[in-house]
Amino acid sequence: MIDSIKRMTDEISGILDGKLCGIWLFGSVVFDDFKLGWSDIDFIALSDVQITEGQAEELLMLRQRLSENEPTNPYYRLFEGIIANKSEYLQNSYSKLVYWGTSGQRITNSLAIDVFSRFELSKYGVPVCGAKDCSIFEEPCRDDILSAVWSHYETIRKYAKQTDPTLYSCGWLLDIARCIYTLRYNDVIAKTQAGVWALENHIFQDEAPLMRALEIRRAPSEIPSEFKSREDIKRWLTELGP
């Protein structure tokens, strides 16, 4: 994975003609909680100059191009984040940025970076290219954090009513644990660590589902694919909803 991060940062810098303020990582990679099959490689890249239309078009499908060139590499497709101009990021007003997400990618002039990402960047962001200073990432205020937790809670209530046989279904349990930790301590931690904390502090009334979710998440990287194909696991996942 480290080699893939280096290759990706080099490619982004090259497309931007080296006019890169910096690239920062956050999320599971920074928390040493990256789990293949569960996790993304979250990043933000900020340029020193305006991104041209040609550069944006070249950056748009960079993940796919690198994946096609190295079909056995599972990491390039997992990069998620934005590539934008630093000044525009600070003003929260964009003329053009490139967004890579789970469901696709796009060139846009409008994007709201979620509170949890901003929180992680401000406190735990790791520079991997260019500027070493994370002070440009402002820590969200308590009201913003409370609002984000409430919004995420509503999302869970909406989409976890009917779970499916994917591992993401039990991932909701870890999200809940993480949100409760954030409310209590005004901080962010890794999903696995949040699950362990919730068990140790008996946060959940019924701890059995969380224990099983942690068992799956903590399995070696080659094991999740086995869990995905097991009928008992798939049945359990689909029955997790209320």
Language model: regions and residue ranges:
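Residues that form or immediately flank small-molecule/cofactor binding pockets and catalytic motifs
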Residues: S28, I83-E88, E215-R218
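Generic structural marker for isolated residues within well-ordered, non-membrane alpha-helices
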Residues: T9, S117, G195
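Catalytic metal-binding acidic patch
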Residues: L25-R65, L78-G81
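Conserved NTP/Mg2+-binding pocket subregion across the NTase superfamily
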Residues: A56, M61-T166, C179
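Helical scaffold of the NTase/Pol beta-like nucleotidyltransferase catalytic core
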Residues: M1-W24, G54-E57, P242
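Conserved nucleotidyltransferase catalytic core and NTase-mimicking acidic/glycine-rich helix/loop elements
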Residues: E120-P242
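Short helix-terminating capping/connector loops at secondary-structure junctions
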Residues: D17-K19, G37, T72-R77
